[in-house]
UniProtKB/Swiss-Prot annotation:
The gene is VEF. The keyword Glycoprotein applies. This is Viral-enhancing factor. The keyword rRNA processing does not apply. It comes from Trichoplusia ni granulosis virus (TnGV). Keywords: Glycoprotein, Late protein. Involved in disruption of the peritrophic membrane and fusion of nucleocapsids with midgut cells. It comes from the Viruses. Glycans are attached at residues 65, 265, 339, 349, 540, 594-595, 642, 683, 698.
């Protein structure tokens, strides 16, 4: 008997490659519609006359044991004769990666064969199908349940007949749809965007008595290692086997050398159990708790207290860290964002290494989880390789500061007597663990308040006394004051939580700041990033100021990558000023799992006493802990670096070959063999200086917040060229203010009410506009244009424009936008004089021309102002009746005294 099978193509989205197994990409196949008894002979061929497909057509003879199955590759249109010794069900794989094509496969079956019962969901009554299957001599049947296709083996026939197929359909489809949603995949029949899902995808389920383990997810199907489907027919929120194996379809690259194999997919499993279960079931039945939450929390507590390397934690201990990461509001957006980032990366350039996983999660989150990660012993790397194959600084903490991220931390470390059952303070939001992560805003409801003293330890209190400080929860300022005359900060009525402290950083001296609990008090998450933990009961803090003299941008560093995928492993800082070498280890696996071969070794030798210090990284390092390893180094010490793999150690801009290289620590720089100190160190510092200035340009909010990077840039610029003003805009306020001009144009209307404020700060490339709420208009006596503001870029295009007739109502607005050198400002005021004022650095400029038209051009640091059009691309008119002009001279507005704004 003859059969023809038309095989469609599986169109891949741009982020998915042929040969990759994610999201069931190679699971689709079409049944021939028969069951072949053992030793049945048949002929098969593929029709290659249809142009387009370029790969062999694959026919599979499937049953319930891989050892008795067969794969047949059809490479041409010639008939192939086949005889198979075992009962089987023939299928033809879809053509993966092809577009606008399909294959036709012909079968000629000589011997007896049995029709395969097939059910396509919702196309006929289920009972009709079950009746057909029950009466059929076939032990096999095949189900199309939308997002899952299932080859049911003889051993599961009775079980399937007892199953509610509608519930089975809902079970599988809800799992896969939810996993798709967690990863941010979007249905798209054209599959041509970075977030496109796989069109017409479906998981293929079968039995495999010869399979590994208890069950597995493979490139072509997922299966229990059994002759029957077992749990694959069990509909239950506790069916961990099924939700676990389906989760493997979404591992992507997140399990490669990350110690997250069998963790990443299970974090999705935990999320669907979180969705399915109520509060009681979540505690009793969820796999992460299993009615033993207090005991599991105690295990985590012991691991933290003992500083156990996270990579050595148990399977479910590592998993539960993701439970608490994803529990908060917007926690799941972290998962969606990191998946989107992966797809962007895979679409652009799959050869560029992915970021270290903890950095990747940190930069994908809406909240700041860095302190939480440090608590459990993982350290996000602060560097990554961008799409141009260049090592780039993340600046994780400054990025979080610029984005106004709130800091999440386990509630048990904030309210130290909190207990989910016995003392939960009647908190309204759902919490399921004493380790759930909270922010200060969520703890206001507790009405717990503290008065906290921050003791400032500084060599020169005059640098900070009387200076303002503030405490922030994300973008919200919750407290502000000034440093008291005793040199301390006093926080009054602050609730529990982790805040960001914006502390004064000195005046004409620069400091590095370190924040921690006072001595002998419970351990504070000590840090240099101003994360302030206010506990209940509360404890005082110590803020230590250490003089900052030599910029970190003058410190050379090396970047160590993994052997196979170039994952980020460590940063090595060579600091000749402090005479230290510091290794920041971010990944304890540099190569093959469980391999103890030497990967990297650093030997520091003291030339004066002959002593040496050694730091070693093996391919796998289960006894090492992520974090910082610091070594003291004297001048003229030799630093021998030994690499087992070429091209995996980057020092400055040089990629080391395999073998040994020896560096020498000189007074102001570290040099390779046969090189001597020269001016190249300044050139490297200048290059880093410009990179970090560009970072501040991208995160311009940091230009208005005192922070360590601005200190670092100031110190580096003084080292490179003290006379240059190239980086003045990035300086700390104390050094920048004398160069800063703030221009405020104030428009007034009838009754001298303020209509509009236009403020321009050329040095910061900033313009802001505040528009008042004047319902009757600026001046009801005028029915013509009363005032106008217009800014244009260097090409004459309008950047901002606003105008009103005298009787035209005004509603409140606030605008903030960037302006640059060469931009022009055109102002019109129907009644000039006192109705239009210019205030420079809070001082009224009395020399502003008293004309209806005012023109100005923005320069790097100032405004050039006049009452006539200014040459060099300035637009000459606002196109209104402006009255007479007196041809006033153009002048530069200057100020004799700087007043901070």
């Amino acid at each position: 008997m003859s059969y023809k099978v038309i095989v469609p193509a599986t169109v891949l989205p741009p982020w998915l490659r042929v040969g990759e197994n994610w999201i069931f990409a190679r699971h689709r196949r079409t049944e021939v519609g028969v069951v072949l008894p053992a030793n049945t002979k048949f002929r098969v061929r593929a029709d290659f006359s249809r142009a387009g497909f370029t790969r062999p057509v694959i026919v599979r003879l499937l049953n319930n044991n891989r050892s008795t199955e067969r794969e047949i590759n059809l490479n041409n249109d010639q008939w192939m004769e086949v005889e198979h010794a075992h009962e089987s069900v023939p299928f033809v794989d879809w053509l993966v990666g092809e577009k606008n094509t399909m294959a036709e496969v012909y079968f000629e079956i000589d011997g007896p064969h049995i029709p395969l019962p097939v059910y396509v969901f919702n196309t006929r009554p289920v009972e009709h199908f079950k009746s057909e299957y029950r009466q059929s001599s076939s032990g096999y049947c095949f189900l199309y349940l939308d997002l899952v296709c299932m080859l049911v083996p003889p051993a599961s026939k009775n079980a399937l007949l007892d199953v509610n197929i509608f519930e089975l359909h809902q079970f599988y489809n809800e799992i896969i749809n939810y996993y798709d949603d967690l990863c941010g995949l979007v249905e798209d029949p054209y599959a041509d965007t970075v977030d496109s899902n796989l069109p017409n995808k479906a998981a293929f389920v079968k039995a495999d008595a010869g399979g590994p383990g208890g069950a597995y997810y493979g490139p072509f199907w997922t299966a229990p290692a059994s002759s029957n489907l077992g749990d694959y027919l069990r509909i239950s929120p506790t069916n961990w086997m099924v939700i676990h194996e389906l989760g493997h379809a979404y591992d992507f690259v997140f399990t490669v050398n990350t110690i997250l194999i069998e963790i990443w997919n299970n974090s999705l499993c935990d999320r669907i159990q979180y969705k399915w279960m109520n509060k009681i079931k979540r505690q009793q039945l969820a796999r992460v708790y299993e009615n033993r939450r207090p005991q599991k929390e105690a295990t985590i507590q012991a691991l933290i207290d003992n500083n156990s390397p996270f990579d050595n934690w148990g399977f479910f201990e590592r998993l539960i860290i993701f439970t608490w990461l994803y529990n908060p509001q917007r926690g799941l957006d972290t998962l969606r964002n990191i998946n989107h980032s992966y797809r962007v990366h895979a679409t652009r350039n799959s050869s560029i290494p992915y970021p270290q996983i903890w950095s990747w999660l940190t930069t994908s989150a809406y909240d700041n989880f860095w302190l939480y990660f440090n608590l459990v012993g993982v350290y996000p790397a602060d560097f990554y390789v961008n799409e141009h194959n260049k090592v780039v600084h993340f600046n994780l903490h400054l990025r979080a500061l610029a984005l106004g991220q709130s800091v999440r931390y386990p509630i048990k470390y904030i309210i130290t007597d909190f207990d989910l059952v016995s003392k939960n303070y009647d908190i309204k939001q759902y919490l399921e663990s004493n380790f759930d992560l909270v922010i200060p805003e969520e703890l206001r409801q507790t009405d717990l308040l503290a008065d906290v003293r921050v003791v400032c330890v500084i060599d020169d209190p005059s640098q900070i006394v009387g200076e303002p400080f503030s405490v922030y929860d994300g973008n919200e300022r919750v407290f502000e004051s000034t440093v008291a005359t005793d040199g301390n900060m006093y926080l009054v009525g602050v609730g529990p939580g982790v805040y960001t402290l914006r502390a004064p950083r000195g005046k004409n001296k620069r400091y590095k700041l370190h924040l921690a609990h006072s001595p002998r008090e419970p351990v504070h998450p000590a840090n240099d990033h101003m994360y302030l933990l206010v506990t209940y009961p509360y404890y005082n803090q110590t803020l230590t100021y250490t003089p900052y003299v030599n910029s970190d941008l003058a410190v050379d560093m090396a970047h160590l990558f993994g052997s196979n995928d170039r994952r980020y492993v460590a940063t090595i800082y060579f600091n000749p000023f402090e005479q230290t070498v510091t290794v920041h280890l971010n990944n304890i696996r540099a190569g093959r799992e469980n391999n103890t071969t030497l990967y990297f070794e650093m030997v520091i030798s003291n030339p004066f006493n002959g002593q040496s210090q050694t730091f070693t990284i093996l391919e796998d390092n289960p006894t090492l802990r992520q974090g910082y390893y610091k070594f003291d180094v004297v001048t003229y010490s030799s630093i021998r670096l030994n690499m087992s793999v070429a091209g995996r150690l980057l020092f400055r801009r040089y990629i080391f070959a395999g073998g040994t290289t020896t560096l020498t620590m000189f007074p102001n720089q570290v040099l390779e063999p046969n090189l001597f100190p020269d001016g190249s160190a300044l050139n490297r510092t200048l290059a880093r200086l410009r990179e970090q200035a560009a970072f501040l340009d991208n995160y311009s909010q940091l230009m208005y917040i005192e922070n360590e990077l601005r200190d670092t840039i100031y110190l580096a610029s003084q080292l490179v060229d003290p006379a240059s003003d190239e980086f003045v805009k990035y300086y700390p306020d104390y050094f920048r203010d004398p160069h800063t001009y703030v221009y405020l144009f104030r428009f007034r209307g009838l009754g001298d009410f303020v209509l509009l404020d236009l403020q321009i700060v050329p040095l910061l490339n900033l313009a802001t506009v505040r528009i008042a709420n004047i319902q009757n208009g600026p001046h009801s006596y005028f029915d013509t244009l009363y005032f106008k503001v217009e800014l244009r870029d260097t090409n004459g295009a309008i950047v901002f424009s606003y105008s009103r007739r005298g009787n035209e109502p005004m509603t409140p607005e606030h605008h903030k936008f960037e302006v640059y050198s060469g931009y022009t400002v055109e102002l019109f005021m129907r009644e000039p004089g006192n109705r239009l004022q210019l205030i420079v650095n809070k001082m009224l400029d009395t020399a502003l021309p008293s004309t209806q038209n005012i023109f100005a051009r923005i320069t790097d640091t100032q405004l050039v102002v006049g009452d006539t059009s200014i040459e060099d691309n300035l637009v000459t008119s606002i196109n209104v009746d402006c009255g007479d002009d007196d041809n006033q001279k153009i002048r530069v507005v200057e100020t004799l005294k700087m007043i901070a704004f």
